[in-house]
């Protein structure tokens, strides 16, 4: 049922019927804030050239770095500022503090390219009354890992559209999100000084802003029909490190949102979060049980056995309490159970099992129909993406096991990857 709901959300994109804003109708200013640290200079220059063509003002903030980014930014009409090394959060907060009279501001990663249509469509949606939005992310790269990441983004799009259907956003992604400037100023204050267990939080800046945006009651949108293009991981090791960091920050903010009673995140966020916690545990438990006790494992898979057992026990308990009608309630309960309850519960269990199988088949068919066109374009990437999903499940278990070391989650703990085209 959950999968059917997710798939039916494919038509909930608020930007589907919105035409890109005409440049002649733009009577306001826009800005882009770009934090940079260790990015490949060719990739960085390509991004800046594109942004300066679209935005009225591009603010580049070097996180403890200057050249060659300063020269590249100034050469293409962007502004450059260098701040002491403090992480992406500090660079973002400083860049936003430099805003003047801009109406909308985009937070853009230094390796993310923004197509013209995405820019103008984003402005059109914001002008319709939204306070912030994020778009679909496409991963660029010829290696199998990058192609698999792009396929994972295709899976994530299904989940993001479901959140948008409920007026929520799963995450205002850090690659490219656009905000109403006055609202961003309010929610970004103190971002770089956020602490947990006495340590500064460095990871999950996008998740932090998303939580704050929901808490502040901002109207958020996800645009499936618009995309930004970023570079995929250059190797499997880099991809695994990214997945581990994202998994940990996801759990971190799930627990923090629960602790702060941030009900505005919506029930789907917490359901998805709890499932993400329980699913790898249950999956590992059932697998271990199947290897140890094959018969019990089969019972868990087959809905008839546990369901019948529960219904029979409940029915026997219920009938045993009916002691006012017959003189011998125990014999009456046994008679009803043997001649009516057994056959009825068997029929009911069979009907529920059939209904579950049909719903599963329909949901699976719908999922395959959505994914198949993408899989035909890149069958190898599709296969490797399944492997990454399996790895992510293992990383989820590892993250939960190392929950007692949560303070070590608060830092990226790695040198930025140097990428080239």
Task: Label each region the model flagged.
Residues 38-53:
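Short, well-formed alpha-helical segments that are part of the catalytic scaffolds
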Residues 43-46, 66-74, 117:
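Acidic helix N-cap motif at the loop->helix transition within catalytic regions
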Residues 207-228:
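Catalytic donor-sugar/metal-binding loop of nucleotide-sugar-dependent glycosyltransferases
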Residues 2-29, 51-60, 69, 102, ...:
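Juxtamembrane C-terminal module of membrane proteins
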Residues 83-98:
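Glycine-rich, basic loop-to-helix element that forms the pyrophosphate-binding segment
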């Amino acid at each position: 049922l959950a999968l059917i709901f997710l798939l039916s959300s494919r038509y909930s994109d608020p930007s589907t019927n919105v035409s890109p804003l005409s440049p002649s109708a733009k009577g306001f200013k826009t800005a882009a804030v770009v934090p940079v640290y260790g990015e490949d200079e060719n990739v960085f220059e390509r991004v800046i050239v594109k942004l300066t063509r679209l935005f009225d003002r591009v603010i580049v903030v070097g996180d403890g770095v200057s050249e060659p980014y300063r020269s590249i930014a100034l050469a293409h009409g962007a502004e450059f500022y260098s701040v002491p090394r403090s992480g992406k959060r500090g660079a973002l907060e400083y860049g936003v503090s430099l805003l003047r009279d801009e109406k909308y501001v985009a937070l853009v990663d230094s390796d993310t390219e923004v197509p013209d249509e995405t820019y103008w469509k984003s402005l059109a949606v914001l002008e319709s009354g939204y306070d912030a939005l994020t778009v679909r992310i496409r991963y660029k790269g010829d290696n199998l890992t990058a192609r698999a990441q792009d396929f994972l983004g295709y899976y994530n799009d299904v989940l993001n559209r479901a959140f948008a259907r409920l007026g929520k956003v799963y995450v205002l992604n850090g690659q490219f999100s656009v905000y109403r400037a006055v609202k961003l100023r309010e929610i970004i204050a103190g971002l770089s000084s956020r602490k947990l267990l006495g340590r500064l939080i460095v990871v999950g800046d996008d998740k932090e802003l998303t939580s704050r945006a929901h808490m502040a009651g901002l109207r958020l949108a996800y645009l499936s029909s618009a995309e930004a293009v970023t570079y995929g991981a250059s190797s499997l090791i880099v991809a695994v490190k990214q997945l581990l960091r994202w998994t940990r920050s996801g759990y971190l903010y799930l627990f923090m949102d629960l602790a702060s009673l941030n009900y505005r995140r919506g029930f789907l966020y917490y359901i998805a979060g709890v499932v993400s916690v329980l699913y790898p545990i249950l999956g590992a438990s059932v697998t271990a049980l199947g290897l140890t006790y094959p018969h019990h494992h089969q019972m868990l898979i087959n809905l008839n056995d546990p369901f019948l057992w529960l219904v029979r026990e409940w029915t026997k308990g219920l009938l045993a309490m009916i002691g006012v009608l017959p003189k011998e309630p125990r014999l009456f309960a046994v008679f009803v159970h043997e001649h009516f309850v057994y056959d009825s519960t068997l029929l009911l269990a069979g009907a529920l099992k059939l209904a579950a199988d049909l719903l599963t088949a329909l949901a699976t068919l719908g999922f395959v129909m959505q994914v198949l066109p993408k899989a035909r374009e890149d069958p190898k990437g599709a296969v490797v993406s399944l492997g990454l999903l399996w790895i992510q499940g293992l990383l989820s278990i590892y993250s939960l096991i190392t929950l007692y070391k949560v303070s070590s989650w608060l830092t990226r703990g790695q040198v930025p990857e140097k990428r080239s085209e």
